From Swiss-Prot:
Coiled coil: none annotated. The lineage of its organism: Bacteria, Bacillati, Bacillota, Bacilli, Bacillales. PROSITE patterns: RIBOSOMAL_S9 (PS00360). GO terms for biological process: translation. This is Small ribosomal subunit protein uS9. Pfam families: Ribosomal_S9. The gene is rpsI. Keywords: Ribonucleoprotein, Ribosomal protein. SUPFAM superfamilies: Ribosomal protein S5 domain 2-like.
Length: 130
């Protein structure tokens, strides 16, 4: 018998997370490492588990994630987005609660590009009066 698996892709800033949900006991594996080993802050792990809290499915699925690009925060939020999309594939009834929590919306905020003549995106060179 083929194993049931739900997939979701999450994105945030420059991070892309490919998430697979498999019925299990709630283990989260990120890039073949345990999530507590991969992410340095407990707050990021709590953030990542939000879709399970909203849908009350904590401990029902094992999560397998491949994530690349960006930093820890962007990656954690990309994983959260991917988990929400995979849960939606698992049961379309979750759409309302996930949507209300804002977990299905891709956060469009990106790093602003550096402009010519400036030191950074908005930081101008130091002004000298004399």
């Amino acid at each position: 018998m083929a194993q049931v698996e739900y997939r979701g892709t999450g994105r945030r800033k420059n991070s892309v997370a490919r998430v697979r949900l498999v019925p299990g006991e709630g283990n989260i594996t990120v890039n073949n490492r345990d999530v507590r080993e991969y992410l340095p802050f407990e707050s990021l792990i709590l953030d990542l588990n939000q879709p399970f809290d909203v849908t009350e499915t904590k401990g029902n699925y094992d999560v397998l994630v491949n994530v690349h690009g960006g930093g820890f925060t962007g990656q954690a939020q990309a994983i959260r987005h991917g988990i929400a999309r995979a849960l939606l594939e698992a049961d379309p009834e979750y759409r309302g609660s996930l949507k209300r929590a804002g977990l299905l919306t891709r956060d469009p905020r990106m790093k602003e590009r550096k402009k010519p003549g400036l030191k950074a995106a908005r930081r101008s060179p130091q002004f000298s009066k004399r």
